[in-house]
Amino acid sequence: MTTWDKCLKKIKKNLSTFEYKTWIKPIHVEQNSNLFTVYCNNEYFKKHIKSKYGNLILSTIQECHGNDLIIEYSNKKFSGEKITEVITAGPQANFFSTTSVEIKDESEDTKVVQEPKILKKSNSKDFSSSQELFGFDEAMLITAKEDEEYSFGLPLKEKYVFDSFVVGDANKIARAAAMQVSINPGKLHNPLFIYGGSGLGKTHLMQAIGNHAREVNPNAKIIYTNSEQFIKDYVNSIRLQDQDEFQRVYRSADILLIDDIQFIAGKEGTAQEFFHTFNALYENGKQIILTSDKYPNEIEGLEERLVSRFGYGLTVSVDMPDLETRIAILLKKAHDLGQKLPNETAAFIAENVRTNVRELEGALNRVLTTSKFNHKDPTIEVAQACLRDVIKIQEKKVKIDNIQKVVADFYRIRVKDLTSNQRSRNIARPRQIAMSLARELTSHSLPEIGNAFGGRDHTTVMHAVKAITKLRQSNTSISDDYELLLDKISR
Protein backbone atom coordinates (compact mmCIF):
# COMPACT_ATOMS: atom_id res chain seq x y z
CA MET A 1 0.00 0.00 0.00
CA THR A 2 1.41 3.40 -1.00
CA THR A 3 1.62 6.39 1.33
CA TRP A 4 -1.18 8.06 -0.60
CA ASP A 5 -3.40 4.98 -0.27
CA LYS A 6 -2.96 5.22 3.49
CA CYS A 7 -3.73 8.94 3.33
CA LEU A 8 -6.93 8.33 1.39
CA LYS A 9 -8.28 6.10 4.14
CA LYS A 10 -7.70 8.81 6.70
CA ILE A 11 -8.96 11.68 4.53
CA LYS A 12 -12.16 9.77 3.78
CA LYS A 13 -13.00 9.76 7.48
CA ASN A 14 -12.82 13.57 7.61
CA LEU A 15 -15.11 14.30 4.66
CA SER A 16 -18.64 13.59 3.56
CA THR A 17 -19.08 10.92 0.91
CA PHE A 18 -19.93 13.60 -1.63
CA GLU A 19 -16.81 15.67 -0.96
CA TYR A 20 -14.53 12.66 -1.01
CA LYS A 21 -15.93 11.21 -4.24
CA THR A 22 -16.13 14.58 -6.01
CA TRP A 23 -12.83 16.20 -5.04
CA ILE A 24 -10.35 13.79 -3.45
CA LYS A 25 -10.86 10.50 -5.25
CA PRO A 26 -10.23 11.93 -8.77
CA ILE A 27 -6.78 13.36 -7.94
CA HIS A 28 -3.59 11.35 -8.40
CA VAL A 29 -0.58 11.75 -6.11
CA GLU A 30 2.89 10.71 -7.23
CA GLN A 31 5.60 10.25 -4.60
CA ASN A 32 9.29 10.63 -5.37
CA SER A 33 11.15 10.26 -2.08
CA ASN A 34 10.00 13.30 -0.03
CA LEU A 35 8.37 15.06 -2.99
CA PHE A 36 4.62 14.57 -3.42
CA THR A 37 3.05 15.84 -6.64
CA VAL A 38 -0.73 16.26 -6.62
CA TYR A 39 -2.23 16.06 -10.13
CA CYS A 40 -5.55 17.91 -10.31
CA ASN A 41 -6.52 17.63 -14.03
CA ASN A 42 -7.20 21.36 -14.55
CA GLU A 43 -6.55 24.81 -13.06
CA TYR A 44 -9.99 25.21 -11.46
CA PHE A 45 -9.73 21.82 -9.79
CA LYS A 46 -6.21 22.64 -8.57
CA LYS A 47 -7.24 25.97 -7.03
CA HIS A 48 -10.21 24.42 -5.27
CA ILE A 49 -8.21 21.47 -3.93
CA LYS A 50 -5.46 23.79 -2.62
CA SER A 51 -7.77 26.29 -0.94
CA LYS A 52 -10.33 23.86 0.43
CA TYR A 53 -8.39 20.67 1.18
CA GLY A 54 -4.72 21.71 1.12
CA ASN A 55 -4.27 21.72 4.89
CA LEU A 56 -6.04 18.37 5.27
CA ILE A 57 -3.88 16.79 2.55
CA LEU A 58 -0.74 18.23 4.11
CA SER A 59 -1.45 17.10 7.67
CA THR A 60 -2.49 13.62 6.51
CA ILE A 61 0.66 13.09 4.42
CA GLN A 62 2.72 14.30 7.38
CA GLU A 63 0.93 11.80 9.58
CA CYS A 64 1.62 8.91 7.21
CA HIS A 65 5.05 9.94 5.93
CA GLY A 66 6.66 12.40 8.33
CA ASN A 67 7.27 16.14 8.40
CA ASP A 68 10.20 16.33 5.98
CA LEU A 69 8.35 16.72 2.69
CA ILE A 70 7.47 19.02 -0.20
CA ILE A 71 4.07 19.11 -1.89
CA GLU A 72 3.58 20.34 -5.46
CA TYR A 73 0.23 20.93 -7.15
CA SER A 74 -0.16 20.36 -10.88
CA ASN A 75 -3.01 21.46 -13.13
CA LYS A 76 -2.35 18.56 -15.51
CA LYS A 77 -3.42 14.95 -15.55
CA PHE A 78 -0.93 12.38 -14.30
CA SER A 79 0.46 11.66 -17.78
CA GLY A 80 1.89 14.38 -20.01
CA GLU A 81 3.61 17.69 -19.37
CA LYS A 82 3.65 18.81 -15.78
CA ILE A 83 2.91 22.38 -14.72
CA THR A 84 3.36 22.53 -10.98
CA GLU A 85 3.06 24.96 -8.14
CA VAL A 86 4.94 24.36 -4.90
CA ILE A 87 2.77 25.17 -1.90
CA THR A 88 5.77 26.43 0.05
CA ALA A 89 6.10 29.46 -2.24
CA GLY A 90 5.78 32.74 -0.37
CA PRO A 91 6.09 33.65 3.28
CA GLN A 92 2.52 33.46 4.39
CA ALA A 93 0.03 30.88 5.68
CA ASN A 94 0.62 28.15 3.10
CA PHE A 95 4.35 28.24 3.78
CA PHE A 96 3.75 27.98 7.50
CA SER A 97 1.47 25.00 6.97
CA THR A 98 3.98 23.25 4.74
CA THR A 99 6.65 23.22 7.41
CA SER A 100 4.34 22.04 10.17
CA VAL A 101 5.79 19.60 12.65
CA GLU A 102 2.41 18.71 14.05
CA ILE A 103 1.58 15.03 13.73
CA LYS A 104 -2.06 14.27 14.36
CA ASP A 105 -3.08 10.88 15.70
CA GLU A 106 -5.87 9.23 13.80
CA SER A 107 -7.81 8.76 17.01
CA GLU A 108 -7.54 12.47 17.75
CA ASP A 109 -8.17 13.98 14.36
CA THR A 110 -10.56 11.69 12.57
CA LYS A 111 -12.71 9.91 15.14
CA VAL A 112 -16.37 10.36 14.26
CA VAL A 113 -18.66 11.09 17.17
CA GLN A 114 -21.91 11.17 15.27
CA GLU A 115 -23.50 8.86 12.77
CA PRO A 116 -24.46 10.82 9.62
CA LYS A 117 -27.70 9.92 7.91
CA ILE A 118 -27.30 8.12 4.57
CA LEU A 119 -29.53 8.76 1.57
CA LYS A 120 -29.75 6.38 -1.35
CA LYS A 121 -29.50 7.73 -4.87
CA SER A 122 -32.47 8.16 -7.20
CA ASN A 123 -33.03 10.09 -10.43
CA SER A 124 -31.35 13.49 -10.95
CA LYS A 125 -33.05 16.69 -11.99
CA ASP A 126 -31.77 18.42 -15.11
CA PHE A 127 -29.63 21.53 -14.80
CA SER A 128 -32.03 24.05 -16.32
CA SER A 129 -34.92 23.26 -13.99
CA SER A 130 -32.61 23.21 -10.99
CA GLN A 131 -31.10 26.55 -11.97
CA GLU A 132 -34.51 28.17 -12.17
CA LEU A 133 -35.44 26.88 -8.73
CA PHE A 134 -32.22 27.38 -6.78
CA GLY A 135 -29.80 29.61 -8.65
CA PHE A 136 -26.54 28.75 -10.39
CA ASP A 137 -24.43 27.52 -7.46
CA GLU A 138 -27.10 25.28 -6.03
CA ALA A 139 -28.01 23.92 -9.45
CA MET A 140 -24.39 22.98 -10.09
CA LEU A 141 -24.44 20.93 -6.90
CA ILE A 142 -27.69 19.22 -7.78
CA THR A 143 -26.37 18.07 -11.15
CA ALA A 144 -22.91 17.10 -9.86
CA LYS A 145 -21.99 13.51 -10.54
CA GLU A 146 -21.95 11.39 -7.39
CA ASP A 147 -21.85 7.76 -6.28
CA GLU A 148 -24.70 5.85 -4.75
CA GLU A 149 -25.00 7.32 -1.27
CA TYR A 150 -24.86 10.65 0.53
CA SER A 151 -24.59 11.57 4.22
CA PHE A 152 -25.83 14.58 6.20
CA GLY A 153 -23.60 16.81 8.28
CA LEU A 154 -19.94 16.60 9.20
CA PRO A 155 -18.10 14.69 11.94
CA LEU A 156 -17.00 16.46 15.09
CA LYS A 157 -13.28 16.25 15.80
CA GLU A 158 -12.51 15.24 19.34
CA LYS A 159 -9.37 17.40 19.51
CA TYR A 160 -11.60 20.49 19.71
CA VAL A 161 -12.44 20.75 23.41
CA PHE A 162 -12.77 23.62 25.87
CA ASP A 163 -9.64 22.60 27.75
CA SER A 164 -7.47 23.16 24.67
CA PHE A 165 -8.98 26.60 23.97
CA VAL A 166 -6.71 29.33 25.37
CA VAL A 167 -8.84 32.03 26.99
CA GLY A 168 -8.05 35.75 26.97
CA ASP A 169 -9.87 39.08 27.02
CA ALA A 170 -10.61 38.80 23.30
CA ASN A 171 -12.58 35.56 23.57
CA LYS A 172 -13.57 34.95 27.21
CA ILE A 173 -17.20 36.03 26.77
CA ALA A 174 -17.64 33.80 23.73
CA ARG A 175 -16.02 30.90 25.57
CA ALA A 176 -18.22 31.35 28.64
CA ALA A 177 -21.38 31.50 26.52
CA ALA A 178 -20.29 28.42 24.57
CA MET A 179 -19.78 26.49 27.80
CA GLN A 180 -23.21 27.54 29.08
CA VAL A 181 -25.10 26.33 26.01
CA SER A 182 -23.19 23.04 25.98
CA ILE A 183 -24.38 22.34 29.53
CA ASN A 184 -27.92 23.72 29.24
CA PRO A 185 -28.83 23.72 25.53
CA GLY A 186 -31.94 25.64 24.58
CA LYS A 187 -32.19 27.41 27.93
CA LEU A 188 -29.95 30.45 27.48
CA HIS A 189 -28.49 32.26 24.49
CA ASN A 190 -30.59 30.72 21.73
CA PRO A 191 -29.32 31.10 19.13
CA LEU A 192 -25.70 31.66 20.10
CA PHE A 193 -24.09 33.63 17.28
CA ILE A 194 -20.27 33.83 17.33
CA TYR A 195 -18.57 36.13 14.84
CA GLY A 196 -15.00 37.17 14.09
CA GLY A 197 -12.21 36.97 11.55
CA SER A 198 -10.72 33.84 10.05
CA GLY A 199 -8.46 31.72 12.21
CA LEU A 200 -9.51 33.14 15.59
CA GLY A 201 -11.10 30.01 17.08
CA LYS A 202 -14.78 30.09 16.09
CA THR A 203 -14.73 26.54 14.72
CA HIS A 204 -12.81 25.34 17.78
CA LEU A 205 -15.45 26.79 20.10
CA MET A 206 -18.31 25.44 18.01
CA GLN A 207 -17.00 21.89 17.93
CA ALA A 208 -16.10 22.11 21.63
CA ILE A 209 -19.77 22.82 22.30
CA GLY A 210 -20.76 19.68 20.42
CA ASN A 211 -18.16 17.50 22.11
CA HIS A 212 -18.95 18.76 25.62
CA ALA A 213 -22.70 18.50 25.07
CA ARG A 214 -22.13 14.89 24.03
CA GLU A 215 -20.35 14.24 27.34
CA VAL A 216 -23.13 15.91 29.33
CA ASN A 217 -25.87 14.02 27.49
CA PRO A 218 -24.67 11.04 25.41
CA ASN A 219 -28.19 10.58 24.02
CA ALA A 220 -28.46 14.10 22.62
CA LYS A 221 -28.81 14.35 18.85
CA ILE A 222 -26.07 16.75 17.80
CA ILE A 223 -25.64 17.83 14.19
CA TYR A 224 -22.53 19.77 13.22
CA THR A 225 -22.06 21.13 9.72
CA ASN A 226 -21.00 24.23 7.80
CA SER A 227 -23.01 26.30 5.36
CA GLU A 228 -21.36 24.70 2.34
CA GLN A 229 -22.27 21.23 3.57
CA PHE A 230 -25.78 22.37 4.53
CA ILE A 231 -26.28 23.64 0.98
CA LYS A 232 -25.03 20.34 -0.43
CA ASP A 233 -27.28 18.37 1.89
CA TYR A 234 -30.29 20.40 0.85
CA VAL A 235 -29.80 20.38 -2.89
CA ASN A 236 -28.90 16.70 -2.90
CA SER A 237 -32.10 15.91 -1.01
CA ILE A 238 -33.87 17.61 -3.93
CA ARG A 239 -31.86 15.66 -6.46
CA LEU A 240 -32.46 12.42 -4.60
CA GLN A 241 -36.14 13.30 -4.19
CA ASP A 242 -36.01 12.99 -0.42
CA GLN A 243 -36.64 16.43 1.08
CA ASP A 244 -38.73 14.89 3.84
CA GLU A 245 -35.71 12.99 5.08
CA PHE A 246 -33.55 16.13 5.02
CA GLN A 247 -36.14 18.00 7.07
CA ARG A 248 -36.60 15.09 9.47
CA VAL A 249 -32.88 14.83 10.17
CA TYR A 250 -32.15 18.52 10.65
CA ARG A 251 -35.37 19.43 12.44
CA SER A 252 -35.05 16.60 14.95
CA ALA A 253 -31.68 17.83 16.24
CA ASP A 254 -31.31 18.70 19.90
CA ILE A 255 -28.33 20.88 19.04
CA LEU A 256 -27.63 22.25 15.56
CA LEU A 257 -24.22 23.81 14.90
CA ILE A 258 -23.60 25.54 11.57
CA ASP A 259 -20.20 27.08 10.82
CA ASP A 260 -19.79 30.05 8.42
CA ILE A 261 -23.50 30.72 8.11
CA GLN A 262 -22.77 33.84 6.00
CA PHE A 263 -22.41 31.67 2.90
CA ILE A 264 -26.13 30.88 2.72
CA ALA A 265 -26.72 34.56 1.86
CA GLY A 266 -27.91 34.78 -1.73
CA LYS A 267 -28.77 31.06 -1.88
CA GLU A 268 -32.52 31.59 -2.01
CA GLY A 269 -33.69 27.99 -1.78
CA THR A 270 -31.27 27.04 0.97
CA ALA A 271 -31.95 30.22 2.95
CA GLN A 272 -35.66 29.49 2.90
CA GLU A 273 -35.12 25.91 4.07
CA PHE A 274 -32.81 27.09 6.84
CA PHE A 275 -35.41 29.68 7.90
CA HIS A 276 -38.00 26.95 8.43
CA THR A 277 -35.45 24.67 10.10
CA PHE A 278 -34.49 27.50 12.47
CA ASN A 279 -38.13 28.15 13.35
CA ALA A 280 -38.87 24.47 13.98
CA LEU A 281 -35.90 24.04 16.29
CA TYR A 282 -36.38 27.33 18.11
CA GLU A 283 -40.08 26.70 18.78
CA ASN A 284 -39.22 23.29 20.22
CA GLY A 285 -36.58 24.70 22.55
CA LYS A 286 -33.64 23.16 20.69
CA GLN A 287 -30.25 24.86 20.72
CA ILE A 288 -28.86 26.60 17.63
CA ILE A 289 -25.23 27.75 17.38
CA LEU A 290 -23.97 29.71 14.39
CA THR A 291 -20.66 31.28 13.40
CA SER A 292 -19.84 33.94 10.84
CA ASP A 293 -17.00 36.23 9.84
CA LYS A 294 -19.31 39.23 10.22
CA TYR A 295 -21.91 40.65 12.57
CA PRO A 296 -25.39 39.55 11.36
CA ASN A 297 -26.39 43.01 10.11
CA GLU A 298 -23.21 43.19 8.03
CA ILE A 299 -23.73 39.96 6.08
CA GLU A 300 -24.44 41.16 2.57
CA GLY A 301 -27.46 39.54 0.94
CA LEU A 302 -28.75 37.89 4.11
CA GLU A 303 -32.53 38.04 4.40
CA GLU A 304 -33.84 40.45 7.01
CA ARG A 305 -36.00 37.77 8.60
CA LEU A 306 -32.87 35.71 9.28
CA VAL A 307 -30.98 38.72 10.64
CA SER A 308 -33.91 39.31 12.98
CA ARG A 309 -33.92 35.72 14.23
CA PHE A 310 -30.19 35.69 14.79
CA GLY A 311 -30.83 38.51 17.25
CA TYR A 312 -33.16 36.37 19.39
CA GLY A 313 -30.27 35.09 21.49
CA LEU A 314 -26.72 36.23 22.18
CA THR A 315 -24.24 37.59 19.65
CA VAL A 316 -20.60 37.58 20.75
CA SER A 317 -17.33 38.32 18.99
CA VAL A 318 -14.02 36.48 18.91
CA ASP A 319 -11.20 38.93 18.28
CA MET A 320 -7.46 38.66 17.76
CA PRO A 321 -5.90 37.67 21.11
CA ASP A 322 -3.76 40.22 22.92
CA LEU A 323 -0.03 39.72 23.32
CA GLU A 324 -0.24 37.79 26.59
CA THR A 325 -2.83 35.39 25.19
CA ARG A 326 -0.83 34.87 22.01
CA ILE A 327 2.18 33.93 24.11
CA ALA A 328 0.05 31.50 26.12
CA ILE A 329 -1.26 29.94 22.89
CA LEU A 330 2.27 29.40 21.61
CA LEU A 331 3.53 27.89 24.85
CA LYS A 332 0.56 25.53 25.07
CA LYS A 333 0.89 24.50 21.43
CA ALA A 334 4.59 23.77 21.88
CA HIS A 335 3.84 21.76 25.01
CA ASP A 336 1.17 19.76 23.17
CA LEU A 337 3.74 18.98 20.48
CA GLY A 338 6.24 17.83 23.10
CA GLN A 339 8.59 20.71 22.27
CA LYS A 340 10.36 23.14 24.59
CA LEU A 341 9.84 26.78 23.67
CA PRO A 342 11.64 29.52 25.63
CA ASN A 343 9.36 32.27 26.90
CA GLU A 344 11.39 34.93 25.11
CA THR A 345 11.02 33.11 21.78
CA ALA A 346 7.28 32.79 22.31
CA ALA A 347 7.12 36.51 23.07
CA PHE A 348 9.09 37.34 19.91
CA ILE A 349 6.78 35.27 17.71
CA ALA A 350 3.67 36.71 19.38
CA GLU A 351 4.97 40.26 18.91
CA ASN A 352 5.54 39.76 15.20
CA VAL A 353 2.62 37.58 14.06
CA ARG A 354 -0.65 39.34 14.78
CA THR A 355 -2.99 38.34 11.96
CA ASN A 356 -4.76 35.30 13.41
CA VAL A 357 -4.18 32.24 15.57
CA ARG A 358 -3.82 29.94 12.57
CA GLU A 359 -0.85 31.90 11.22
CA LEU A 360 0.52 32.28 14.73
CA GLU A 361 0.63 28.49 15.08
CA GLY A 362 2.02 28.22 11.57
CA ALA A 363 4.89 30.52 12.50
CA LEU A 364 5.57 28.40 15.58
CA ASN A 365 5.65 25.24 13.47
CA ARG A 366 8.09 26.92 11.12
CA VAL A 367 10.44 27.87 13.96
CA LEU A 368 10.26 24.44 15.60
CA THR A 369 10.85 22.63 12.32
CA THR A 370 13.88 24.75 11.49
CA SER A 371 15.42 24.35 14.93
CA LYS A 372 14.84 20.60 14.88
CA PHE A 373 16.26 20.22 11.38
CA ASN A 374 19.40 22.18 12.32
CA HIS A 375 19.72 20.48 15.72
CA LYS A 376 19.41 23.81 17.52
CA ASP A 377 17.25 25.12 20.32
CA PRO A 378 14.34 27.37 19.21
CA THR A 379 16.03 30.59 20.28
CA ILE A 380 15.09 34.15 19.36
CA GLU A 381 17.91 34.11 16.79
CA VAL A 382 16.37 31.07 15.08
CA ALA A 383 12.95 32.71 15.15
CA GLN A 384 14.34 35.95 13.70
CA ALA A 385 15.92 34.06 10.82
CA CYS A 386 12.78 32.00 10.17
CA LEU A 387 10.34 34.90 10.32
CA ARG A 388 12.37 37.75 8.82
CA ASP A 389 10.25 37.77 5.66
CA VAL A 390 7.07 37.97 7.74
CA ILE A 391 8.48 40.77 9.88
CA LYS A 392 9.59 42.73 6.80
CA ILE A 393 6.15 42.44 5.24
CA GLN A 394 4.43 43.55 8.42
CA GLU A 395 6.75 46.48 9.09
CA LYS A 396 6.54 47.58 5.48
CA LYS A 397 2.77 47.61 5.69
CA VAL A 398 2.13 49.32 8.99
CA LYS A 399 3.65 52.41 10.60
CA ILE A 400 2.40 54.20 13.68
CA ASP A 401 2.07 57.51 11.85
CA ASN A 402 -0.08 55.81 9.22
CA ILE A 403 -2.32 54.38 11.95
CA GLN A 404 -2.67 57.83 13.48
CA LYS A 405 -3.62 59.36 10.14
CA VAL A 406 -6.23 56.69 9.35
CA VAL A 407 -7.78 56.93 12.82
CA ALA A 408 -7.80 60.74 12.75
CA ASP A 409 -9.47 60.78 9.33
CA PHE A 410 -12.00 58.17 10.44
CA TYR A 411 -13.09 60.18 13.50
CA ARG A 412 -12.69 63.55 11.76
CA ILE A 413 -10.11 64.89 14.15
CA ARG A 414 -6.51 66.03 13.67
CA VAL A 415 -3.45 63.83 14.10
CA LYS A 416 -2.05 66.35 16.57
CA ASP A 417 -5.18 65.83 18.69
CA LEU A 418 -4.12 62.20 19.15
CA THR A 419 -0.71 63.26 20.44
CA SER A 420 -2.01 66.17 22.53
CA ASN A 421 -2.98 66.26 26.22
CA GLN A 422 -6.68 66.69 25.47
CA ARG A 423 -8.84 64.30 27.49
CA SER A 424 -12.28 64.97 26.06
CA ARG A 425 -14.12 61.77 25.13
CA ASN A 426 -14.19 62.51 21.40
CA ILE A 427 -10.36 62.64 21.47
CA ALA A 428 -9.48 60.16 24.23
CA ARG A 429 -11.40 57.23 22.75
CA PRO A 430 -9.90 57.50 19.23
CA ARG A 431 -6.48 57.86 20.89
CA GLN A 432 -7.02 54.61 22.80
CA ILE A 433 -8.16 52.87 19.62
CA ALA A 434 -5.09 54.13 17.74
CA MET A 435 -2.81 52.90 20.53
CA SER A 436 -4.49 49.50 20.53
CA LEU A 437 -4.11 49.26 16.75
CA ALA A 438 -0.45 50.23 17.01
CA ARG A 439 0.08 47.49 19.58
CA GLU A 440 -1.66 44.91 17.40
CA LEU A 441 -0.28 45.86 13.99
CA THR A 442 3.29 46.93 14.65
CA SER A 443 6.29 45.40 16.39
CA HIS A 444 6.95 48.53 18.45
CA SER A 445 7.29 48.17 22.21
CA LEU A 446 4.88 49.78 24.67
CA PRO A 447 7.28 52.66 25.45
CA GLU A 448 7.82 53.30 21.73
CA ILE A 449 4.07 53.47 21.13
CA GLY A 450 3.60 55.75 24.12
CA ASN A 451 6.34 58.04 22.86
CA ALA A 452 4.64 58.27 19.45
CA PHE A 453 1.48 59.49 21.18
CA GLY A 454 2.93 62.58 22.81
CA GLY A 455 5.45 60.96 25.11
CA ARG A 456 2.96 58.95 27.12
CA ASP A 457 4.02 56.29 29.62
CA HIS A 458 3.90 52.62 28.62
CA THR A 459 1.28 51.96 31.31
CA THR A 460 -1.04 54.37 29.48
CA VAL A 461 -0.71 52.24 26.36
CA MET A 462 -1.38 49.07 28.36
CA HIS A 463 -4.51 50.64 29.84
CA ALA A 464 -5.69 51.73 26.38
CA VAL A 465 -5.23 48.23 24.93
CA LYS A 466 -7.13 46.59 27.80
CA ALA A 467 -9.91 49.18 27.68
CA ILE A 468 -10.47 48.77 23.93
CA THR A 469 -10.30 44.96 24.14
CA LYS A 470 -13.01 45.03 26.81
CA LEU A 471 -15.16 47.54 24.91
CA ARG A 472 -14.99 45.44 21.74
CA GLN A 473 -16.67 42.63 23.65
CA SER A 474 -19.53 44.76 24.95
CA ASN A 475 -19.91 47.68 22.54
CA THR A 476 -20.90 46.78 18.99
CA SER A 477 -20.16 50.28 17.69
CA ILE A 478 -16.58 50.22 19.01
CA SER A 479 -16.06 46.68 17.72
CA ASP A 480 -17.34 47.62 14.26
CA ASP A 481 -15.17 50.76 14.14
CA TYR A 482 -12.12 48.76 15.15
CA GLU A 483 -12.68 46.12 12.47
CA LEU A 484 -13.17 48.81 9.81
CA LEU A 485 -9.96 50.53 10.86
CA LEU A 486 -8.08 47.24 10.83
CA ASP A 487 -9.23 46.70 7.28
CA LYS A 488 -8.31 50.23 6.16
CA ILE A 489 -4.85 50.10 7.71
CA SER A 490 -4.03 46.61 6.43
CA ARG A 491 -4.88 47.37 2.81
From Swiss-Prot:
Tagged with keyword DNA-binding: yes
Residue numbers spanned by region Domain IV, binds dsDNA: 372-491
Region annotated Domain III, AAA+ region, chain positions: 155-371
UniProt: ATP binding residues: 199, 201-203
Principal cellular location given in the protein's record: cytoplasm
GO aspect biological process, one term: DNA replication initiation
Family the UniProt entry places it in: Belongs to the DnaA family.
Record-given protein name: Chromosomal replication initiator protein DnaA
Species whose genome carries this gene: Francisella tularensis subsp. holarctica (strain LVS)
